[in-house]
Structures are given as structure tokens and as C-alpha cells.
Amino acid sequence: MGLFNFVKDAGEKLWDAVTGQHDKDDQAKKVQEHLNKTGIPDADKVNIQIADGKATVTGDGLSQEAKEKILVAVGNISGIASVDDQVKTATPATASQFYTVKSGDTLSAISKQVYGNANLYNKIFEANKPMLKSPDKIYPGQVLRIPEE
């Protein structure tokens, strides 16, 4: 549990983050619909509240992997600057690291930096499915889960 920071202007565009033309309940509903469409397991077991660019995610009984994927999926929405993790996992597990993609990054380069081996990029790709559809489709500002080697 804790507060995770994201790049507010990067990510999936679900509403007009610049003019804020949606109320908080509408934003939370759009985020929940987005989560349900991703196919992340147990996405329907969380509750989301949005206030001033901060998403608070609550829930109980999720796996560590599902929890992290949900937090990353919520944080990688344009207009979300931080995610307050209030989700309780079913069993304690080691948390993954998070990595913010920079301009020019590739999964291979990130893998080399994190694991010391560029060929382990698929481990990062698999850890970020279904949010990532292809290992080549990452963008600056996107936050990725980096599982243990």
C-alpha cells in the first residue's frame, strides 16, 4: 500500500484532462470500465475514486500480480498523476518494481538496465499484459511493472 506517482499527461485518454470536462464520479466510472475492458483478473473487485488527478484504489482479496496490474493500468491514464494503493492482497507477496519509460527506451534496453540481460525483455512484456499488446508499443511516461528476475 502506498502512493505511486505517474506522468499526468501520458497514457490512455478517457476524458479531457486539460479542461476537466467530466465530474469525479464520471471519471471513476470511465476508469472502472477501462479496467474491465483490459481483462485484468479481479479488476471488478476494486473500487476507484478520483479527486484532483489522484486515483484511490480500494479492494480486498486480490493477488499481488493483479493488484499491481490494476494500479499500473489506472496510473497510465492521462489525467492521473498519482494512485493511492489501498488494496489488500489475499496473501503477502514480493512487490514488483515500477519503471517509467523514457524517450528512446525499448523493453530490451530496460531489461538490460534492470536485469543485466537484454534478452529478458519478454519477462517485462508478460508482466505488463494485457496492458501491453506488443513489446514494441511502449511510450515515454508509461509506467511498467518490473518483476523479480
From Swiss-Prot:
Principal cellular location given in the protein's record: cytoplasm
PROSITE patterns attached to this UniProt entry: BON, LYSM
Annotated knockout phenotype: Deletion mutant shows retarded growth at high concentrations of K(+). Deletion of the gene impacts the abundance of muropeptide species. The absence of YgaU leads to the activation of the Cpx pathway.
Keywords: Cytoplasm, Potassium
Induction: Transcriptionally regulated by CpxR, which binds directly to the promoter region.
Annotated LysM domain residues: 97-146
Record keyword Glycosyltransferase present: no
Cellular location(s): Cytoplasm
This protein's name: Potassium binding protein Kbp
Organism: Escherichia coli (strain K12)
Gene from which this protein is expressed: kbp
